[in-house]
């Protein structure tokens, strides 16, 4: 139901931001970060392990789709293979050319890091979403998320979606999680906004929130279009 006395039928035009977003302005200085936010133990181990393999790829190599290392050297019967979900069949099939091309490197690397890659199913999966391998490329040049689907690596100049609690983005260059305060800045909350002392609650709230400036832009443009303000 539309009130014709308010809506005149014209499209709402939202303003477009033309400037360049400097990601660094959202971050605290590395020396000011609480040590608890720096990755360690299994998380650091598995990322450093994968980084050793990434550095063996040729410049220009395209890594797609998800590399599933714990399936790379297994031999499945036709019956076993056909029992897998379609997505898994596709990944295994599409992984084969890359695994074959770098087979000696993969074999040595996999055997050296077997314990961590098999410790959790997701540790054996790499989702490389940064395009072709570049000169001096590294997992730690980018953003990283430990997801249920695997270790996702995304370009360092786009911030990953904030997902409540379980998939806190890792800022690769500093090997640390993004802090709740930095998440709040990314969502355009003012510095005076009070965050919960419980990080889990803060990450959840910020992951479920919408950028403040975006909300303001939509509401103000809508009200102006309807000549309410």
State the predicted function of each range.
Residues 1-54:
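Flexible, glycine-/basic-rich loop-and-beta segments that form/coincide
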Residues 35-229:
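C-terminal target-recognition/interaction regions appended to catalytic cores
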